[in-house]
Amino acid sequence: MFGTRIHGRGGQGVVTAAELLSVAAFDSGRHAQAFPSFGSERTGAPVVAYCRVSENPIRTREPIVAPDALVVCDASLLGLPEVLAGLTDADLDRTIRYTA
């Protein structure tokens, strides 16, 4: 199973990105699920969404604590401890950065 956690702010398309990943995986013949984790936040508030992809049926629905891939859509969130939670130093060495 491959787990992706996506962090961003409300209005940046974080939930949509997770859903698109899961649809692409499903269209490729894999099992997939995507779900957000947020309360009654407003535009600009931190949001996290998850996407799991597997060759087998996915029976869990819990948040992804140790993701295989981490996407951060807003660099200002990197100061929040929950954003990098579950990553090891080796994971951080494989960081790909893009600045527009």
Model-derived features with residue positions:
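Active-site cofactor/cluster-binding pocket
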Residues: 1-100
